[in-house]
Amino acid sequence: MSGISSKGLEELKNNGWLILEDGKKIKKEFKFKDFKQSIDFLKDIQPSADALDHHPDVCIYYNRVIVELTTHDMGGLTDLDYKLAIKIDELYKMKTSNL
């Protein structure tokens, strides 16, 4: 398992991910119409997280979903965080393209 390249980090930042804790964690807030859409989004994330065996920390505040990613056992960011972040962004674009 390797870390995220500087190019990968730059891509994530350009997509709205915040780099936290000196590059050990990434975080992004996703906004929806209502609570149901927030919950549905989390359900959409679950299969991808399971497929990668890499699960985000998530907080839901009615119509907002805050996702944080880090690889706890590596003490920072890895390619798993990058892959899941990119997938989450794709899912969000698909979910919100009809709003």
Curated annotation (Swiss-Prot):
Pfam families in the record: Pterin_4a (PF01329)
Classification via Gene3D superfamilies: Transcriptional coactivator/pterin dehydratase
Key words of the record: Lyase
Top EC class of this enzyme: lyase
Residues spanning the signal sequence: none
Chemical reaction(s) catalysed: (4aS,6R)-4a-hydroxy-L-erythro-5,6,7,8-tetrahydrobiopterin = (6R)-L-erythro-6,7-dihydrobiopterin + H2O
EC number: 4.2.1.96
GO molecular function: 4-alpha-hydroxytetrahydrobiopterin dehydratase activity
One annotated GO biological process: tetrahydrobiopterin biosynthetic process
InterPro entries, alphabetized: PCD_sf, Pterin_deHydtase
Family: Belongs to the pterin-4-alpha-carbinolamine dehydratase family.
Matching NCBIfam families: PRK00823.1-2
Protein name per Swiss-Prot or TrEMBL: Putative pterin-4-alpha-carbinolamine dehydratase
Organism field: Saccharolobus islandicus (strain M.14.25 / Kamchatka #1) (Sulfolobus islandicus)
